[in-house]
Amino acid sequence: MTFPLALEDYRPCSLKLDQTQLSSSQRDHLQANIALARDAIIFFTALANAKGLGGHTGGAYDIVPELLIVDGFVRSGEAVLPVYFDEAGHRVAIQYLMAALNGHMPIEKLLHYREFGHGLYGHPERADSRGIFFSSGRLGHLWSYVNGVATANPNQAVVLFGSDGSQQEGGDAEAARYAVAQKLNLKLIIDDNDVTIAGHPSHYMPGFDVADTLAGHGLVVDSGDGEDLDALYARIRTALTTPGPVALVNHRKMAPQVPGIEGLPKGHDVIPVDFAFEYLQKKEHRQAAEMLTAVKKPSHPQTFRGSTSDKVKN
C-alpha cells in the first residue's frame, strides 16, 4: 500500500541563526512544508481511527510550524541538539512523521500508526534505528530528563516542546527551578492551545497562566501567536541565541483551520473519520480521503473488559 500524499515533495528548509528574518522564498518553502506535514498527520491518524484504533491528532498538528523551524536550524549545522524532545507524549505522530521524512523509516510505515507489532506506539518509545531518540510518558515526565541532557551538552541549545497541560504538573515546576538555578541552555517551546484531555484549562483551572507560572520560576518568557510564521521564526531564533533557559509560549486554537475539532477538546484525540474525509477532500487529497472510507475494521469476536465484540477500543 502506497502512502497517498506526496511526501516525496517535502524538501527540508535550512535556516541560519545569523539571519534575523525569513526571506520570501524561505517563507513559501516553510509554508508548503507545514501544509504537507499537517495534512499527512490528519490522514494517518484518521486512518488509525478508521481501523478502530486509538490515536491523537490535534497536538501533533499544532506544533508543526515550530518544529520545522527548529529542524531548519538543526539542518544548517547550528549548535542545536538534533532531537525534538516532546513532553506531551500524545503528540507522537509528529515524531513518526519526522522519522519518515528524515529517512529513518519507510514513509509507508506511517500507514500502520498504532497497529500492534509495528512499533508506532501511542507515546514515544526510544528506538534510534527508527528515528525515535527518546521515550516519554503522558505529561510532565520529560523535562527533568532533558535537564540532564542539557547538562551533558552545554555547548548546544536543547529544545523541549511543551504544552499547557504538561505545565500543570508538579514535576515540571521542579524541573523549571532546576533549569534556572543551573542556567541550562534549554529552550522550552510551548503550545498554549487551552485544550487538554480534561477540557479547557481556562475553565477548569481559572487563574492558571503558563507564561506567568514560568516567569515566576525565573525563566525568560516570550509569548506570541503560534500561527504567525514570521514572528514565530524571529522568536525561536532569539530564544536559541539567548543564553540560559528560555520559554516561548505560542498561543493558538487547538487544530487551527480543521473543521469539527478546531479549538475543541475532541481535537486532542484522534480526528473523527468524517471530519478527516472532508478536510482531505477540501485539500484535494482525494486518494487519501477515499482510503479512509475503504478501510474495513478488523473483526475481533473476543470480548474484554472495557470493550465489546464490535468495538476494539473503549
PLM features per residue range, with description:
Residues 26-30, 34, 38-51, 57-182, ...:
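Cofactor-binding active-site loop characterized by glycine-rich and histidine/acidic residues
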Residues 9, 89, 255-258:
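Glycine-centered small-residue hotspots that permit tight backbone geometry or close packing
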Residues 77, 125-292:
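Glycine-rich ThDP/TPP pyrophosphate-binding loop and its adjacent helix/strand module
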Residues 25-28, 32, 283-286, 303, ...:
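Alpha-helix boundary/N-cap detector
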Residues 2-35:
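Non-catalytic, mobile gating and regulatory segments of ester bond hydrolases
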Residues 35-38, 296-314:
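Non-catalytic terminal/interface segments that mediate subunit docking, oligomerization
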Residues 15-22, 53-57, 307-313:
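RNase H-like, metal-dependent ribonuclease domains
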